[in-house]
Regions:
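Flexible coil/loop interruptions and hinge/linker segments embedded within long fibrous stalks
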Residues: 5, 33-35, 219
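Intrinsically disordered, low-complexity acidic regions enriched in Pro/Ser/Thr
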Residues: 11-14, 25
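A surface/extracellular/periplasmic glyco- and lipid-processing/surface-interacting theme
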Residues: 65-111, 118-389
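Secretory targeting signals
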Residues: 1-4, 15-22
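N-terminal export leaders
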Residues: 6-10
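A general structural signal for well-ordered secondary-structure junctions
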Residues: 19, 33-34, 180
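N-terminal low-complexity, Pro/Thr-rich disordered segments
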Residues: 26-73, 80
């Protein structure tokens, strides 16, 4: 810290010397005048030293961690050039009969959102959006269509979206925000490029009709080469990363051995169980452990629950039916964040489509997250989140 200069004011009053008045002799007969008395000399006061008023020291600013990091995991990045390539998100169906999946375990972030198809009770299942950047899964499957909430979720990333299409009004909505997302590289629009493929073992026939919705696969690294857009990669961190493990907000949080997030009313719960050995949360679906096609169970470093109002409707011009909507643009709500067996809660806020989420803890301090893979659950704002120690 630079030294603070101090100034000393010295007040000195210099003495004033007055010459003595000499006697004036006046020759008068018979008398002589006595010499006039010299006036008293004024005393010169001694110099006075005045102490200066101390200049208040500015409050110290917290150090800024400027080390380069992978924007979607927060992991330190030795060579920033390695991050200069597009992030690729893929739309993956998540109903029981559409499992097992591939590639989910290699994503930096996975969003869990409403699927949109209603069951007999009027409830919707879920759809996943794994996002790849620090590493690219060779194959991701199955692949399905875009939903409206993908735009505000992925615009802060400048992402390419692997998909099989969308309703006409949703396509128009995607095109409107083309500055921040590339959603036109669908299965049909990239035929012959090797960006997508078909797993013949997943093709099925129902009532004489052949279906490929469970069989479509995406190759993210190949898909990224089909455009020159977003070659510099995400230009901002998606989450507020802590500079060290000691800075992570959950260090002083409450215990969270298990987490349950409902989607269909108070049922259809996605759940997480903390594993002390790996220091990660193992994920389960409503019917059992979330396991990939290769037998690997999903386990993540961070679980982030963002509660937001869910409903169905149309928010842009064009044909097509109502789609599931999550109100996160220019909104706020409650969040829960868990890491290493502990959790904190607070308020999330999000501005416009391309603005990242902001998170504030209940005590008013900003959230600091641990680096690593993150699952983001997006239940309704009225959902009852169960966290047990």
């Amino acid at each position: 810290m630079a030294k603070i200069s101090r100034r000393t004011a010295l007040l000195g009053l210099g003495g004033v010397g007055l010459a003595g008045i000499g006697a004036v002799g006046i020759g008068l007969a018979g008398r002589t005048n006595a010499p006039a008395a010299a006036p008293p000399t004024r005393e010169t006061p001694a110099p006075v030293s005045q102490s200066p008023t101390p200049t208040p020291k500015p409050a110290p600013k917290p150090p800024v961690d400027s080390r380069p990091r992978w924007p979607l995991t927060g992991v330190l990045l030795e060579n920033p050039k390695k991050a200069q390539h597009p992030a690729v998100a893929v739309k993956v169906p998540d109903n029981k009969y559409e499992h097992p999946q591939r590639g989910i375990d290699e994503a930096d972030i996975v969003f869990v959102q409403l699927e949109g198809y209603l069951d007999a009770d009027g409830y919707s299942g879920t759809r996943l959006v794994p996002v790849f950047h620090s590493r690219m899964a060779e194959t991701v499957m199955p692949v399905r269509s875009i939903r409206p909430v993908d735009i505000p979720l992925l615009s802060p990333i400048d992402a390419i979206i692997g998909n099989t299409g969308a309703a006409r009004w949703v396509i128009n909505y995607v095109k409107h925000y083309r500055k921040h997302v590339e959603g036109m590289l669908s299965y049909m629009n990239t035929r012959g490029t090797g960006s997508y493929g078909t797993d013949p073992s997943r093709v099925y026939t129902y009532q004489g009709q052949t279906y490929y919705d469970r069989a479509t696969v995406c190759h993210p690294a190949v898909l990224a080469k089909q455009t020159k857009r977003f070659r510099k990669g995400p230009q901002q961190s998606y989450f507020p990363w802590a500079s060290s493990s000691a800075e992570v907000s959950t260090v002083h949080g409450k215990k969270a051995k298990t987490i349950e997030v409902p989607y269909k009313g108070d049922g259809y719960r996605m759940s997480y169980a903390y594993d002390k050995k790996s220091r990660r949360y193992r994920r389960s679906m409503p019917w059992g452990p979330h396991v990939m096609a290769d037998g690997k169970r999903i386990a993540v470093d961070n679980v982030l629950v963002i509660k937001a109002k869910q409903h169905f409707g149309k928010i842009y011009s064009g044909s097509g039916h109502d789609e599931p909507l999550h109100d996160i643009i220019d909104k706020s709500g409650t969040f829960y964040y868990a890491n290493r067996g502990r959790y904190v809660t607070g308020t999330w806020r999000k501005g416009g489509v391309a603005k990242p989420f902001q998170f504030t803890l209940a005590d008013g301090t900003p959230l600091k997250m641990a680096t690593g893979q993150t699952f983001v659950e997006l239940p309704d704002d009225g959902a009852k989140i169960r966290i047990k120690d």
